[in-house]
Amino acid sequence: MPGQRIRIKLKAYDHELLDESAKKIVEVAKSTNSKVSGPIPLPTERTLYCVLRSPMKHKDSREHFEKRVHKRLIDIIDPSPKTIDALMRINLPAGVDVEIKL
């Protein structure tokens, strides 16, 4: 597939798991002789939640929770059919969300 690229977006709460998965994908793509751009770290999505500690009163007593979503972007340029087959067979951990665009 000359002139094409595969864009892979990875998302996870755990950045170590995310980096491990990105490394696996890059190794698989390079082993099939494809050009790889990345992993490019994208901005971390940070969400704060403020919750009252007490079920009824004491509004001044609150608890804060934070959710961070780490993201990485990998581009595979001019992928061969071997590359696509290898990417389909790769096993990634359950905590990693993978979004692939052709």
From Swiss-Prot:
GO terms for cellular component: ribonucleoprotein complex; ribosome. Keywords: Ribonucleoprotein, Ribosomal protein. One of its GO terms (molecular function) is structural constituent of ribosome. GO terms for biological process: translation. SMART domains: Ribosomal_S10 (SM01403). InterPro entries: Ribosomal_uS10 (IPR001848), Ribosomal_uS10_CS (IPR018268), Ribosomal_uS10_dom (IPR027486), Ribosomal_uS10_dom_sf (IPR036838). It comes from the Bacteria. Pfam families: Ribosomal_S10 (PF00338). Involved in the binding of tRNA to the ribosomes. Belongs to the universal ribosomal protein uS10 family. Part of the 30S ribosomal subunit. This is Small ribosomal subunit protein uS10. It comes from Thermotoga neapolitana (strain ATCC 49049 / DSM 4359 / NBRC 107923 / NS-E). The gene is rpsJ.
